[in-house]
Amino acid sequence: MGTVNSLEAGIDEAGRGPVIGPMVIAIVGWSNSEAEGIGVKDSKQLTPSGRSRLYKLIVSKAPCVRHVIVEPSEIDYYVNRGLLNELEAIKMSELIKACSGVTRVYVDSPDPNPSRFRGFINVKDVELIVLNHADESIPLVSAASIVAKVIRDTIISRLKETYGDFGSGYPSDPRTISALRRWINNGTLPPIVRRSWRTIKRMTNSRLF
């Protein structure tokens, strides 16, 4: 994929909330009209096959597609210091700088105060448009959401080949809780677990499992 003189871009993440697995943040540099033209929509509204189809189109057509994988150990470091939003902003800043020619970036803010989150993003000469739920209204952010989700789902599938089925990885999933309980009872939490999550702290401090 080449670069052009001026690009818009969208940024979004997948996997902020799970207790298992990495978070993936992606940027797509293109145009909203072209992203909309291939039928891009919020990844949560798509089937896995629909996401896969659009992912292939985005990667083949968009001038800039980049992603970063944030491992549980790094997430834990920042969460234990109350800095998860700052961690996302650091990674987003790196992605923006990696997309040559980007002049305007739409960001899906994880912070309920988008202007506060905007202040964490360290880039120059780029117009930042930071919104809540941007993946629902901005095609480029939807495209980034699709890229992040497909990449993370692929990683999760590979992790299950190594560690067995742990469900979705979200604390609300009984299969996830069952896997966590099994690992805790065996005395070893694998490195794919986010130890900073309250779910883990409750389970390791409880005698009810």
Curated annotation (Swiss-Prot):
EC number(s) reported in the record: 3.1.26.4
Binding site for a divalent metal cation: D12, E13, D108
This protein's UniProt keywords: Cytoplasm, Endonuclease, Hydrolase, Manganese, Metal-binding, Nuclease
Alphabetized GO MF terms: manganese ion binding; RNA binding; RNA-DNA hybrid ribonuclease activity
Class in the EC hierarchy, top level: hydrolase
InterPro entries registered for this protein in UniProt: RNase_H2_suA, RNase_HII/HIII, RNase_HII/HIII_dom, RNase_HII_arc, RNase_HII_hlx-loop-hlx_cap_dom, RNaseH-like_sf, RNaseH_sf
UniProt superkingdom: Archaea
Keyword Disulfide bond: no
Disulfide bonds, paired cysteine numbers: none
Pfam families associated with the record: RNase_HII
NCBIfam families linked to this entry: ribonuclease HII
Family recorded in the similarity comment: Belongs to the RNase HII family.
Protein name, per record: Ribonuclease HII
Gene source species: Caldivirga maquilingensis (strain ATCC 700844 / DSM 13496 / JCM 10307 / IC-167)
